[in-house]
Curated annotation (Swiss-Prot):
Source organism of this protein record: Pseudomonas aeruginosa (strain ATCC 15692 / DSM 22644 / CIP 104116 / JCM 14847 / LMG 12228 / 1C / PRS 101 / PAO1)
Cross-referenced PANTHER family: PROTEIN SLYX
Family: Belongs to the SlyX family.
Transmembrane regions listed in the UniProt entry: none
Gene name per UniProt: slyX
Protein's recorded name: Protein SlyX homolog
InterPro entries the UniProt entry points to: SlyX
Amino acid sequence: MELDARMDDLECRQAFQDDTLQALNDVVVEQQRSIERLQLQVAALIKRLEDVQGLVGEAGEDEAPPPHY
C-alpha cells in the first residue's frame, strides 16, 4: 500500500512540475517577444537620432563661426 501512495505522490509532483515548466516556458516566450519588439524600437530610435544629427550637422556647416573666433 505504501508503494501505491508513493507512486501517487510522484505522479502528482510530476504533474505540478509539468504545469510549472509550461508556465515558465510561456513567460520566456513572451519575454523574448518583448525583447524583439524593444530591439526594433531601439533601432528605429537610433535611425531617427542619426537623421536628426545629420540635419543639425548640415545646418551647422553653412553657418559662419561666431564673432569671437
